[in-house]
Amino acid sequence: MAGSNILHKIKLKAGFCGSAPDMGRGKSKMWKNITHGFHCVKGKSSHPMEDYVVSEFKKLEGHELGLFAIFDGHLGHDVAKYLQTNLFDNILKEKDFWTDTENAIRNAYRSTDAVILQQSLKLGKGGSTAVTGILIDGKKLVVANVGDSRAVMSKNGVAHQLSVDHEPSKEKKEIESRGGFVSNIPGDVPRVDGQLAVARAFGDKSLKLHLSSEPDITHQTIDDHTEFILFASDGIWKVLSNQEAVDAIKSIKDPHAAAKHLIEEAISRKSKDDISCIVVKFH
């Protein structure tokens, strides 16, 4: 196999979003009705693309797992890249993954962040948001997140947010209790210590005393009313509501085409950020 073809397959599996538009699609081997696709586009900023994506199915101990994630880096891409490579592996290595999935996710988020902080000389001073989804045997979905990348489910055409936006204004008391402050400058969004626009993130060693990496976690059962789930970085959510996003893609059957269309819609609404989107279809 030619080197370029090998690289292409690696990129489709891992979901690296480079400076040019990147894309991928796939489907469950156990559940033929479940398909997934992703699309990524670099924003208007001068720095390199800082989004990394995971979108794949894998078999483990007789089960099939759908692994989906958006990692939206800031002040560099190294932390987001590290998460793409390591976070799911760390979750799946937890001894209680099958018996207490939520606890396994919390432990892995915590331990992964600890390693990132220990390796700050290598990984840099930046950080990353994360939204992760683990689909177990096509029936059970566990979503975890830190930051403002978001997961949204469409059921009977109605949008249901599965993640929590960790905004500094909402967590002001917690930030202040740790010795930090939330700036509120006219014309700007609230920021932790006047710097970061999210209250929870991986990395960010210089702010870590005032930041949390504790995820919010939700559990969902996939049923006949579940149409699709979308995971996306905040470049979507700055310009589209949850319901607008669902309405924009509900009639598009191919998940990659749906992800691409949603990003194009966000760009048409003047979104300037890096944008990554995963769509998982159940029909």
From Swiss-Prot:
Catalytic activity: O-phospho-L-seryl-[protein] + H2O = L-seryl-[protein] + phosphate; O-phospho-L-threonyl-[protein] + H2O = L-threonyl-[protein] + phosphate
Gene3D superfamilies (alphabetical): PPM-type phosphatase domain
Sections of the chain in a coiled coil: none
EC number(s) stated in the UniProt entry for this protein: 3.1.3.16
Annotated binding of Mn(2+) 1, by residue: 72-73
Cofactor note: Binds 2 magnesium or manganese ions per subunit.
Family annotation (CDD domains): PP2Cc
Cellular component annotations (GO), alphabetically ordered: plasma membrane
Chain sites annotated for binding Mn(2+) 2: 72, 234, 273
Annotated keywords: Hydrolase, Magnesium, Manganese, Metal-binding, Protein phosphatase
GO molecular function: metal ion binding; protein serine/threonine phosphatase activity
SUPFAM superfamilies in the record: PP2C-like (SSF81606)
InterPro entries reported for this sequence: PP2C (IPR015655), PPM-type-like_dom_sf (IPR036457), PPM-type_phosphatase-like_dom (IPR001932)
Span of domain PPM-type phosphatase: 35-282
Cofactor (UniProt): Mg(2+); Mn(2+)
Family under the similarity heading: Belongs to the PP2C family.
PANTHER family: PROTEIN PHOSPHATASE
Entry protein name: Probable protein phosphatase 2C 58
Organism expressing this protein natively: Arabidopsis thaliana
